[in-house]
């Protein structure tokens, strides 16, 4: 389990740097990406849920039950917002420490990626150039057929389709040839990158697994610290939810009791 956690964390951290390397944009820390996604998701759920609650309370049934769900919803939203403020710095510290501990490994992997990219770029450029040439050649062959169709009538449509079919097959076959050639050219570099990654991992295992065990221990320690620091915030959340749940339960029981009395009186 510890190995899985460490592996996912390393891939997550290196993945963000690899994206920055290929796209050449400003790097975003793992915590910033997680925080942005979580914030957007929570805000959408919160706003959408509040709209549904408001619609229900405005309905005839909602007015009759008078559960005060909207007040409880606002209280719950406030409690969740407080939790996010409390746990944010703790999670930030966790990512900072984990990123620091895996800095050397990430630098080595990024170096390998950069080297492979430089080697395969000429093949990618060549493939793109050949593909553009094939498309242009196909367009030149098809253009006269389109003019011929515009000059003719409906009976020439079938003739045009018969003429286009071999041209389309020719383009497909030529494209397949270029793709196969590109795959053959890139295969050695893919194998090389895979071997280098295996070498990096093997280096961690050498010496009785001391280096790998150190990574595991550090990741486990950071997770333990995060868990301990988050406990007070989670307890505050639980305490904040108790009044909300109790208020909802009381309102619901009162509504059920009122409905029962009305049914018995009829």
Curated annotation (Swiss-Prot):
Residues 1-18 form the signal peptide. InterPro entries: ApoA_E, Apolipoprotein_A1/A4/E. Sequence repeats lie at residues 67-88, 89-110, 111-121, 122-143, 144-165, 166-187, 188-209, 210-231, 232-242, 243-266. The lineage of its organism: Eukaryota, Metazoa, Chordata, Craniata, Vertebrata. One of its GO terms (biological process) is protein stabilization. Participates in the reverse transport of cholesterol from tissues to the liver for excretion by promoting cholesterol efflux from tissues and by acting as a cofactor for the lecithin cholesterol acyltransferase (LCAT). As part of the SPAP complex, activates spermatozoa motility. It comes from the Eukaryota. This is Apolipoprotein A-I. The keyword Signal applies. Homodimer. Interacts with APOA1BP and CLU. Component of a sperm activating protein complex (SPAP), consisting of APOA1, an immunoglobulin heavy chain, an immunoglobulin light chain and albumin. Interacts with NDRG1. Interacts with SCGB3A2. Interacts with NAXE and YJEFN3. It is found in: Secreted. Keywords: Cholesterol metabolism, Glycoprotein, HDL, Lipid metabolism, Lipid transport, Lipoprotein, Oxidation, Palmitate, Phosphoprotein, Repeat, Secreted, Signal, Steroid metabolism, Sterol metabolism, Transport. Glycosylated. Palmitoylated.
């Amino acid at each position: 389990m510890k190995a899985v956690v460490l592996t996912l964390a390393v891939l997550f951290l290196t993945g963000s740097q690899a994206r920055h390397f290929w796209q050449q944009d400003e790097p975003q820390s793992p915590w910033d990406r997680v925080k942005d996604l979580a914030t957007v998701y929570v805000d959408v759920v919160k706003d959408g849920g509040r709209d549904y609650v408001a619609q229900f309370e405005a309905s005839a049934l909602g007015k009759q039950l008078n559960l005060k769900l909207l007040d409880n919803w606002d209280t719950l939203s406030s409690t969740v917002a407080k939790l996010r403020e409390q746990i944010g710095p703790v999670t930030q510290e966790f990512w900072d420490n984990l990123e620091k501990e895996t800095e050397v490994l990430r630098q080595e992997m990024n170096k390998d990626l950069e080297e492979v990219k430089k080697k395969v770029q000429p093949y990618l450029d060549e493939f793109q150039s050949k593909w553009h040439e094939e498309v242009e050649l196909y367009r030149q062959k098809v253009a006269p057929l389109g003019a011929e169709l515009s000059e003719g009538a409906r009976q020439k449509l079938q003739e045009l389709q018969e003429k286009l079919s071999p041209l389309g097959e020719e383009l497909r076959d030529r494209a397949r040839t270029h793709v196969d050639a590109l795959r053959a050219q890139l295969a050695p570099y893919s194998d090389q990158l895979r071997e280098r990654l295996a070498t990096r991992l093997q280096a961690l295992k050498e010496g009785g697994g001391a280096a790998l065990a150190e990574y595991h221990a550090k990741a486990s320690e950071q997770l333990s610290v995060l868990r301990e620091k988050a406990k007070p915030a989670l307890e505050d959340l639980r305490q904040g939810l108790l009044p909300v749940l109790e208020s909802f339960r009381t309102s619901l029981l009162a509504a059920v009791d009122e409905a029962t009395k009305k049914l018995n009186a009829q």
